[in-house]
Amino acid sequence: MKMSTLRAVPVAAACVAAPSAAPAADLARETAVLVAVFRQQVREHLDAAERARGTVLCIAIDPGGAAQSPGQEFMARLAGEPSVRRAAGCDARPKGAVEAMTLRPAIIVTAGPIEWVADDEAWVAVAYFRSATYSAQRRYRVVREREGWVSLGPILLDGPL
């Protein structure tokens, strides 16, 4: 899976370098949802064993056909997590993703698109890449609670055969 094959999401100008005409409130809401998704991905992928290996989480947002690394303003929202990197600093190699400069093991996570189910609920497509054989695409449920936006985890849809 290449990052350029992932699906698109409209993103705030604060998230990536590209300008946007969306209203500021919508951009702030999208940014908050994406931050919630990436925080949840840190919890999901970087357990004690991965942290001991020095694994980093490299994040990208796809605003329309090509994944892009978030801008500094977006990254500042995740500053409390020292293992988070911009995807531009990582390489997706068949045997395993790595941080380009250090060759530390990496997981590349791309968020998008956002599907608004309600004013206080979004479903977000998330793709991750560890290696050519260990990668996936899923949808995550993100809801607005009193303390802000929270990613509740993957959406499992089941139906009759």
Region annotations inferred by a language model:
Residues 21-136, 156-161:
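Flexible low-complexity loop/turn motifs enriched in small/helix-breaking residues
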